Amino acid sequence: MGPMAHRSHTGTGPSQRQLRVGELIRRTLADVLNRGEIHDPELNRLSITVGEVRCSPDLKVATVHVMPLGGKDVEEAISLLSKHRGELRHHITRQMTLKYAPDLRFRPDETFDRLDETRRLFSDKTVMRDIRGGGEADED
């Protein structure tokens, strides 16, 4: 059996390992931020939600989707997290046994924006009528 023998994932989405490692990184970062383990008063005054972490197939890059409470100060939060990238990586390596500590890249979590848009759509009168079956439905 060669080194590629364990590769059974052939789909286009993330593998189970990518999902599992991403979730472990998400939990670790959320815990570190909640406990204020990064000694930066500017960062600790922000209540940051770690929404999702997506890992590259080789697990060397982790894209961390974050949002400060209330959706304000997003750029400041990303800047502060990026500034403390090394310390955050250190916390991850202490919690997990990975061959490489992933490079952390911080991005705004737009899940909340999509959720607001979905709520807005569901409150639209036309959409509500269609959901209740009062609209004309096209049969395909």
Curated annotation (Swiss-Prot):
Q: Determine the domain of life of the protein's source.
A: Bacteria
* GO terms of biological process kind: maturation of SSU-rRNA
InterPro entries the record matches: KH_dom-like_a/b, RbfA, RbfA_dom_sf, Ribosome-bd_factorA_CS
SUPFAM superfamilies, per database record: Ribosome-binding factor A, RbfA (SSF89919)
Q: Keywords for this entry?
A: Cytoplasm, Ribosome biogenesis
Q: Which PROSITE patterns match?
A: RBFA
Gene Ontology CC, one term: cytosol
Q: Where, subcellularly, is it found?
A: Cytoplasm
A Gene Ontology MF term for this entry?
Answer: ribosomal small subunit binding
Please name the Pfam families in this protein's record. RBFA
Function, in words: One of several proteins that assist in the late maturation steps of the functional core of the 30S ribosomal subunit. Associates with free 30S ribosomal subunits (but not with 30S subunits that are part of 70S ribosomes or polysomes). Required for efficient processing of 16S rRNA. May interact with the 5'-terminal helix region of 16S rRNA.
Q: HAMAP family recorded for this chain?
A: RbfA
Subunit record text: Monomer. Binds 30S ribosomal subunits, but not 50S ribosomal subunits or 70S ribosomes.
Family from the record: Belongs to the RbfA family.
Spell out the protein name for this chain: Ribosome-binding factor A
